[in-house]
Amino acid sequence: MNLSKHFTVAEMTRTSTGLPNVPTGVSLSALTVLCATLLEPVRERFGPVAVHSGYRGPEVNAATPGASRHSQHMLGQAADFHVVGQTLETVFRWIVNESNLQYGQAILEGRAPGKPTWIHLSLGAPYRVGSACQQALVFDGQRYAPYRV
């Protein structure tokens, strides 16, 4: 089932845990909005997007190392990805500085200092409000810091 032109439910729910990971109702709706309003513009600008993690049900989230107990992934509101053939920094800079995307958080993430491995992008308003929107951060595997141009 397609969520948008280029993204499917299967792609956005893939997990290596072996646990059931099926979004329903509100989570499925949020996934559709996420794909249409955030991931599609990235794909249109740069080309194919490889999703590392989309929806994560509570069991899958609990089995994911380093995942927040309050992750927007559990609500279908976030995705971790990279763009095939593009540097993470190029895509991230475009999202934060050049696009008009209305995101909640854009995070350049990695598990080793100075080595980002994916971009986390989550829905903004009305899913997040106020200062929790348009947050651009860098995560080095230990701490979050504001993104600096």
Residue ranges with predicted function:
Residues 23-24, 50-56, 90-95:
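N-terminal start-of-chain detector that recognizes signal peptides
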Residues 66-72:
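Non-catalytic scaffold segments within catalytic domains of secreted glycoside hydrolases
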Residues 70, 79, 83-149:
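Catalytic cores and adjacent binding grooves of peptidoglycan-active enzymes
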